[in-house]
Swiss-Prot record:
A GO cellular-component term linked to this record: nucleus
The keyword Ribosomal protein appears for this protein: no
Keywords: Coiled coil
Pfam families: Tsc35
Residues in coiled coil: 47-111
Protein name: Testis-expressed protein 35
């Protein structure tokens, strides 16, 4: 308030109270319209509210556009997420199938290893049996008899001890005596002996000196 109080004048005590109060009358008080000040604002220029309103409208429109863009992005993300979920499910099924196939292969390998091991054991056993069978034969080929003499010397000694039979050429064949007589001419001819008719007299089937 710009009104100033008037300093009281010095009066004598003889004056009455009413006269003193009239002298001390204050100046009239000025009043302001606060409603108008609230609407216009104490520090705003004329026409400033319209600019603010326009700016607010622009900001709201931009916010709406951004919200729509965000909504579209969200829809795309939801679709992509659904696709990702489907892809994950497919991958899980494929992994499950691969695990089952791997189990089957492992079982097949385990089952195939046992026959192979059995076959190897059988081969080793057969080799050992063959070695045990061939060793005595090799020893017999190398040594003969209790004295341990070589087999070749033993054969020579036996050949010397056995008497020679003059009819040995006739017994070279395993068939009958007649066939042996038929075989002898060629052998005798090769050895420089008599021809076939010289031996014909020994044949029981011969009716004459020659056939």
């Amino acid at each position: 308030m710009s009104a100033k109080r008037v300093e009281p004048k010095k009066t004598s005590l003889s004056k009455n109270y009413r006269a003193v109060c009239l002298e001390l009358k204050p100046e009239p008080i000025k009043t302001y319209d606060y409603k108008g000040a609230k609407q216009e604002g104490p520090f705003t220029k004329p026409g400033g509210t319209k600019e603010l309103k326009n700016e607010l409208r622009e900001v709201r429109e931009e916010m709406k556009e951004k919200m729509e863009e965000i909504k579209q992005i969200k829809d795309v993300m939801d679709k992509d997420f659904d696709k990702l979920q489907e892809f994950v499910e497919i991958m899980k099924e494929m992994q499950k199938d691969m695990d089952e196939k791997m189990d089957v292969l492992i079982n097949i390998q385990k089952n195939s290893k046992f026959p192979l091991r059995r076959g190897l054991k059988m081969q080793q056993e057969l080799r050992l049996i063959g070695k045990t069978d061939t060793e005595p034969q090799l020893r017999l080929r190398k040594m003969d008899g209790a004295g341990g003499a070589p087999l070749s010397l033993h054969k020579k000694m036996v050949e010397r001890q056995q008497p020679k039979d003059p009819m040995d050429p006739l017994h070279q064949c395993d068939s009958c005596f007649e066939k042996c007589l038929l075989c002898t001419p060629q052998n005798n001819y090769d050895r420089g002996k008599l021809p076939y008719h010289a031996w014909a007299s020994f044949s029981p089937l011969a009716s004459g000196p020659a056939f």
